[in-house]
């Protein structure tokens, strides 16, 4: 079965997210993981965050998603515009792990969020069309009835991406969603994400400077101990970008920031 992207629901209004003087601390530690965090994530654009492993990038996403556990303390101001609903209710979150349900088929994993609001096991026909369209776009239409354990790691991650896109939320948090893919598939799915997430507010965690340069409108570098977010640049050109001489210079700037981080 096939359908085009135009069949998807009308996007919800984009949301601007602002963090002022954010501080995140584990209760068993005297030193915060994140401190004096000031960030602006403009509505309908991609904000990419880079930083060394363990600097708190994933904790930042989990805070935005409302997923921090009771062992973590957060202080600071979080502002969203428009503020008509709680941020956690307007977010789709794609973690580093695919988190697929092993007993559900690929198609049913993509439809998982649709099932939460359904009566019994009923899922509307148009939702199945949308899910199958996404599976076709990520190259897994022929695997819709397979179980996750029958897929490779990269294929599982593509299912997770399709499931995230299926939620059609105005804010999308992505924690290294393309890291397990081969180069060709990674580029193709970056292109797909740029198309399907157009006009959404996206916060992307990545270790790959080239990925940030290709996808971001705004780039932050997490630095120091405790970590804070240093704003690096705003990129005006349309995405996804080709990697040219200007991109190579920006990559050198990013690498210099990461290499000289004394955290």
Feature-to-residue mapping (PLM):
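Helix-to-loop junction immediately C-terminal to a conserved catalytic motif
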Residues: 65
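Conserved ABC ATPase signature
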Residues: 147-151, 155
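Hydrophobic anchor residue at the start of the ABC signature
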Residues: 161
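Helical segment within the ABC ATPase nucleotide-binding domain
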Residues: 186-198
